[in-house]
Amino acid sequence: MSHKSCYTNPGTGGKRPRNDKGNKVTVVLGAQWGDEGKGKVVDLLATESDIICRCQGGNNAGHTVVVDGMEYDFHLLPSGIINSKAVSVIGNGVVIHLPGLLEEAEKNEKKGLKDWEKRLIISDRAHIVFDFHQAVDGLQEVQRQAQDGKNIGTTKKGIGPTYSSKASRTGLRICDLLDDFKEFSTRFKNLAQQYQAMFPTLVVDVEGQLKKLKEYAERIRPMVRDGVYFMYDAINGPPKKILVEGANAALLDIDFGTYPFVTSSNCTVGGVCTGLGIPPLNIGDVYGVVKAYTTRVGIGAFPTEQLNEVGELLQTRGHEVGVTTGRKRRCGWLDLVILRYANMINGFTAFALTKLDILDVMDEIKVGVSYKLKGKKIPYFPANMDVLQKVEVEYEKLPGWKSDTSACRKWEDLPVKAQNYVRFVENHVGVPIKWVGVGKARESMIQMF
């Protein structure tokens, strides 16, 4: 490989050319509070992808994919693992609970998922979620409830405590587990002791845990790679279709979400670069997944929430129950302020609008188009939760189509009023809608362009 300079001498006023080489990465992100149906969009794109990656979060995410009538549930594994021709990557930004990962793989194996371990690559820089992180997650929730009378509503999967360990530089990574086990054991014991000092009721079976971790190390060793080099090679090698599957969603982002009722990672587009070690230059299409109405799990402000028959109807018709927690989701009308905000941050190429069929029975459908604060319209999405609680939503009313859309497979098949609803969203947010979902199966995603 020659290392000749590829740009002219700066002294002569020459400019370095923009390096536009390499494969582009397609990204799928949630544009609301999660549960938008990202798994289905990923599944659609994964059939043609060579590499499918997760870049952040852990097994707090829940994606359901239906293939040939069989439902697969994914939490840590990229849902593209179903594609037997593709490689799945768990990036450095993901936090990994090893027993959770193996249990999930085995459960899906029983449903027919074959040879997953030959298709999975785990970044050696990913941090490990230990059982005590999960225990601490539960203890912190109890503490919050006692102090403030409210909790964050975490999934108790140890995600927050693991990212805390990572930020305070006491965390342990996959590369540590696979290296000198004696050194790993010492650091593991120190970390456990730190948590026990903070939470005196915390019980940690150190020796039992280490014994299991040693076994996990051997199970995963063949799957572990240097993630940065792997992605660099994939991007700069022969043409490949690379897909990144975001977990959680814009309003759960640690920086841009409805803080503190958020997750502990960046679930917006920036998390793709930091969670896989890829340059922004190689980000291609960014698809936002939007449900045709809004849902939220746990507490926190929710301007368009409907605590009435509408909310109940959306909840029952949409089967709005969390994949990871089994909790009922709160439901409300579609909120375009949220979508515009998510688009400001992510710069979506297009939207996938899912679960349109849930609105089939409505006489009238409302869409939140703007917020007012003290009688004045505000052009932004408030950062402060107390302020967000106080906003007044301005709605536009659209007539319902009152007919079953679940059998529609082409845009022309949709009732005109349903088409109007889709166009209304596009025009108000300024992002084209590429897919419209009218059911659970792969076939029920109508592609528009």
From Swiss-Prot:
Its EC number is 6.3.4.4. Its cofactor is Mg(2+). GO terms for biological process: 'de novo' AMP biosynthetic process; IMP metabolic process. Keywords: Cytoplasm, GTP-binding, Ligase, Magnesium, Metal-binding, Nucleotide-binding, Purine biosynthesis. The keyword Cytoplasm applies. SMART domains: Adenylsucc_synt. Binds 1 Mg(2+) ion per subunit. The active site is at residues 35, 63. It is found in: Cytoplasm. GO terms for cellular component: cytoplasm. Residues 1-10 have a biased composition (Polar residues). InterPro entries: Adenylosuccin_syn_GTP-bd, Adenylosuccin_syn_Lys_AS, Adenylosuccinate_synth_dom1, Adenylosuccinate_synth_dom2, Adenylosuccinate_synth_dom3, Adenylosuccinate_synthetase, AdSS_1_vert, P-loop_NTPase. Residues 1-22 are annotated as: Disordered. This is Adenylosuccinate synthetase isozyme 1 A. It comes from Salmo salar (Atlantic salmon).
